[in-house]
A protein has these predicted regions:
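Accessory carbohydrate-recognition regions in carbohydrate-active enzymes
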Residues: 1-181
Length: 181
């Protein structure tokens, strides 16, 4: 989900690494999470895919796992439930029975998750992840019971941009608010 000339591109991400600059590939069977920075139409790029968010229920899993079998917090998704149009995306995360929605405004992105009742639910954040590697520095500040802010710095040392052979350096600043519902 994005807007013309928008500063964020909220998208499901199906795999880290590989030929996946947009973050999403239809042939994959699982979603690793939803990221707020993407590039599309450029082939393999190896950067962005930052601020990964994944809703989960049940036992805590601290890594994403791998497409095709290694357990983690990623989830299979119901392709027939996908709805995508300009500025909006919706899908059912089958393993958790969570409905996920994404939308964007010119300067922000929003996610909404509908969790199954009577399940231990959580929203997991991966601040180190980027499509082609990891960010090299992360900082988080807890603002209040429902808000965090911070930044992540991405440099060639963390991979990306041709496996770190380029000189891509960028910093992503963020603020996240979590309603108490």
């Amino acid at each position: 989900a994005t807007t013309p000339f928008g500063m964020v591109q909220v998208s499901p991400n199906t795999i880290t690494g590989g030929d996946n600059g947009s973050g999403y590939s239809y042939e994959h069977e699982t979603i690793e999470g939803f990221a707020f920075t993407q590039m599309s139409g450029i082939g393999w790029y190896g950067d962005l895919g930052n601020l990964l968010v994944m809703p989960t229920v049940g036992d805590l899993r601290t890594n994403s796992g791998k497409e095709g079998g290694v357990a983690g917090y990623r989830s299979r998704y119901d392709k027939s439930s996908e709805e995508a149009k300009a500025g909006y995306y919706k899908v059912l995360l089958s393993d958790y029975q969570i409905q996920a929605e994404a939308t964007a405004a010119p300067h922000s992105g929003m996610l909404r998750f509908v969790f199954p009742e009577n399940k231990q639910s959580r929203i997991q954040l991966d601040l180190a992840r980027r499509v082609g590697g990891t960010s090299t520095y992360q900082a988080v500040q807890v603002i209040d019971d429902h808000t965090i802010a911070g930044r992540m710095e991405c440099t060639p040392e963390g991979g990306g941009w041709g496996n770190g052979e380029g000189s891509s350096r960028y910093t992503v600043y963020f603020m996240r608010s979590f309603p108490n519902r």
